[in-house]
Amino acid sequence: MAALSPTVRAALQSQAAGEEPWEQRFKRIMSTTLKNPGAFRSQPWFTRRDAILEAVLPSRTDPTHEKVLAVVNGLVQAKAVRADEGGAIYDALLQRVGRYNSSNVQSNLDHLVQDVREAVAMKAQEERGSMGSLVALNGFLSTLPSTVNHGQSDYVGFVGALRQLIAEVPQTLVYRTGPFYYFQTSRQGLQTVNLTKAFQNLSALWGVTTSAQTPMATAALLTPNTRLLLLLVAPFTDSRTVNGDTYLGHLLTLYREALRDARLDEITYSEIRDVARATGQDDSRALQSTLNFLVSQQTKRLPEDVFLTPQQTTVLRYLQKAIELQHAREPHERADRLLDAVVADLEPSFYSKHRHFITKLLDYFQRAAALNPHYFMSIVKNKHWTPPPGFYTGDFELPEVVHDSFQWDDTEDGAWSRPLAEQVNEEEPNTDYLAEYRSAFSDNREEKNQKKEWESLVDMMARWKTHRQSALDLDDEIEELSSTNPFKHLQPQF
């Protein structure tokens, strides 16, 4: 007798000895019932029920055990295992398949987890009483279009914020009356919004931007009903939910700022009041005045240290080296002109990329050169110098000149060189460009007070031209020259 294949052998081994076709089984049940109804009726209910269900609708056969049995038969034929070991291998394989490779087990677990989540969510919604509101909101959103012509991201973000408002805020209700859907809240007074008309009003405003040069009547664009909806939804939006550059984004930003400044956190105040009462402070007026002082008064803080980025440090060192080289080439040139010459030599792309930092740095250099030339020269030559605290805010102080009696001499070592105590001839013309400002920084405390000194310094700074103003004036002159016709004298005269 030829050896059977493992698959055929498994099929023969898995057949039941008393298996009968479905027709015979159904006929047997019906004939038993017809011939002797009492015999079948006297059997237990579960036995009769299983027999009827199996006869009418047989259960689905599972070929897993046949496949496992075929594998075991193949192992036995290949002499990988002995015949007496086949039963143990078959049982172990069935257990492993049922534990790790059962799609039914995995799907049942997934369904169980999903059912638990839905039950928890339903319980939470029932406790808040907002299940009907969410159902009504979903019905309203189903009437809205899924896409809009402009501002799709703003449209989706606003709808998500509305859904979050209704799901998280208590004392909110969404209901339908006739063809309209309404949103009602009673948290701070009863307020009702017609959602249908509000979204009809907003349908043409998603993604619309306005220009400051073209003013428009904003009251004509939105109805009071729509503005109330924006006010209620505003706390649940931000600049990423609705673009802040759009018309609706500007309104939502204004509403958020207004609500943030106007409303107080009652929970925080009640907690502070409870703590104060626990410590023996029962005076509510004193507590309120203390809180108002803590909230309204701003303590004076010291300016923070300036931490430069690697790019800013590179720009600072480059400008220091450029000023030092320019001073070495022209040692008798004035400080403001040397700084302007350094700025004029900068590459336009380099200046535009670091314009803010360069402007602040050159302004500090201008002040240092005017008030203390020796300090200015020291920071230019110091390769480890960094701006002082308050550099960006302007809240800093420059070191004063130690010897105010020394005169500045432009004819010797330059405008910012170390002052020399030499007597200047009064008959020679004074070439010092800061001569008119010396009196403002003299030691004559009896004649001029500190207020006049600062006023003189402000006037001095106001009359000076920055490097940007000089560049703009130069561009205007070049444009004026280019607008004229250089060949006008060659044209024929009529």
From Swiss-Prot:
Q: What is the organism lineage in this UniProt record?
A: Viruses, Varidnaviria, Bamfordvirae, Preplasmiviricota, Tectiliviricetes
Q: Which family does it belong to?
A: Belongs to the adenoviridae hexon-linking protein IIIa family.
Concerning PTM, the database record says: Cleaved near the C-terminus by the viral protease during virion maturation to form the mature protein.
Modified positions (Phosphothreonine) in chain numbering: T268
Protein's UniProt name: Pre-hexon-linking protein IIIa
Q: Which UniProt keywords apply?
A: Capsid decoration protein, Capsid protein, Host nucleus, Late protein, Phosphoprotein, Viral genome packaging, Viral release from host cell, Virion
Site (Cleavage) found at S483, T484
Which sequence positions carry the modification called Phosphoserine? S439, S456
